[in-house]
Amino acid sequence: MAPQIFVVQTTLPSTWIEPEVGAFAQSLLEAGAACIQHSSIRSTYRWEGKIESSEEWRLELKVSQEAVDGVLSALRKQHPYSTPQITYWKAESSQEYADWVDSA
């Protein structure tokens, strides 16, 4: 079986500026994430009976199996949305990358 890591995704408000997103990401690194990529996206979704479209920040985290519970707990505790998108799954990776994620 190929080595596995966790990939975690969430979104943050577009009203946040880059340093705020960076500080949020830093707190998740301190909670155990190995790597966090963030980028600006446009989301279209249903909210309170209406179809909405807005810009947001997407964060994608790479996390070891040992650290995932702590990272998810920190993410839930610190997230600014009342109903945050927090999705996560196991992903196969190269042995070298999994080793790096585990050691980060």
Predicted regions span which residues?
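Positively charged, small/polar-rich N-terminal and surface patches that mediate targeting and assembly
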Residues: 1-104
